[in-house]
Amino acid sequence: MTAGVIDGKQVAAQVQEEVAREVAALKAEGLTPGLAVVLVGDDPASKVYTANKERTAKELGMHSVLYHLPATTTQQELADLVMQLNRDPAIHGILVQSPLPEGLDMDAVIRLIDPRKDVDGFHPENVGRLWIGQDGLVPCTPAGVMRLLDAYGVDPKGKHAVVVGRSNIVGKPMAALLLQRHATVTICHSRTPDLAETCRRADILVAAVGRLQMITAEHVKPGAVVIDVGINPVPGFKKRIRGDVDFDSVQEVAGLITPVPGGVGPMTIAMLMANTVKAARMQTGR
């Protein structure tokens, strides 16, 4: 059996089409959703990511502004910019790109962002809302994974989902979203004994640990849905990336699998755009 491949690019394009229609409808009512992207320093990957986010927002008809601050920016200067954006009625979403230069406290910055403008979904208020099942802004990558599952007719209800990784950005919110959809969820991490045995019990296996091709065929139950969130450089290849899953071996066992690139990655920016529209609606009562 060879697994079906989940096309994240196609689903992301569908999400962006929906967002573009929503933006056009809001603009017809006199409201243009606005996204502010803040980049501190000159990390090459961060410069690419922020440029993509700003460009995508503009392509979908939003108001988008990129603030590129020097690496010498102080915590207070960054805080002042965030507070200024909190007060700006033309900005509905604020994203501060990580990682920040050494000496700057990302957690403190996140806490300063107005929770209604926290389109990354990282503010403690949004984290709490997610875990108690209240409406709020949800982290983009886990939200994108749920959209992929829906697009391919995978209902988590009654299924055993295993999430490998416990980060605040992916692992924990992923578990919360699966719980909301009535899956039985196990979270694995670096201290989990018998990882392969636990993973083999999964109907839905989400790998979000940041280790190159760590998940192999021995970790996967035949017919399982395997979602690979990892983005890892391949040693010896300047521009090649691979996921946390050994795609070639796992594809022979799984029922559905996401590739890297072209799986979860495109969904992250698409869901950021959806969050920005949602934030604009929340702030204006529409």
UniProtKB/Swiss-Prot annotation:
Pathway: One-carbon metabolism; tetrahydrofolate interconversion. Homodimer. HAMAP family: THF_DHG_CYH. The keyword Cell division does not apply. Catalyzes the oxidation of 5,10-methylenetetrahydrofolate to 5,10-methenyltetrahydrofolate and then the hydrolysis of 5,10-methenyltetrahydrofolate to 10-formyltetrahydrofolate. This is Bifunctional protein FolD. CDD domains: NAD_bind_m-THF_DH_Cyclohyd. It comes from Symbiobacterium thermophilum (strain DSM 24528 / JCM 14929 / IAM 14863 / T). Belongs to the tetrahydrofolate dehydrogenase/cyclohydrolase family. Keywords: Amino-acid biosynthesis, Histidine biosynthesis, Hydrolase, Methionine biosynthesis, Multifunctional enzyme, NADP, One-carbon metabolism, Oxidoreductase, Purine biosynthesis. It catalyses: (6R)-5,10-methylene-5,6,7,8-tetrahydrofolate + NADP(+) = (6R)-5,10-methenyltetrahydrofolate + NADPH; (6R)-5,10-methenyltetrahydrofolate + H2O = (6R)-10-formyltetrahydrofolate + H(+). GO terms for molecular function: methenyltetrahydrofolate cyclohydrolase activity; methylenetetrahydrofolate dehydrogenase (NADP+) activity. The gene is folD. GO terms for biological process: L-histidine biosynthetic process; methionine biosynthetic process; purine nucleotide biosynthetic process; tetrahydrofolate interconversion. The keyword Amino-acid biosynthesis applies. NADP(+) binds at residues 165-167, 190, 231. Signal peptide: none annotated. GO terms for cellular component: cytosol. SUPFAM superfamilies: Aminoacid dehydrogenase-like, N-terminal domain, NAD(P)-binding Rossmann-fold domains. It comes from the Bacteria. Its EC number is 1.5.1.5, 3.5.4.9.
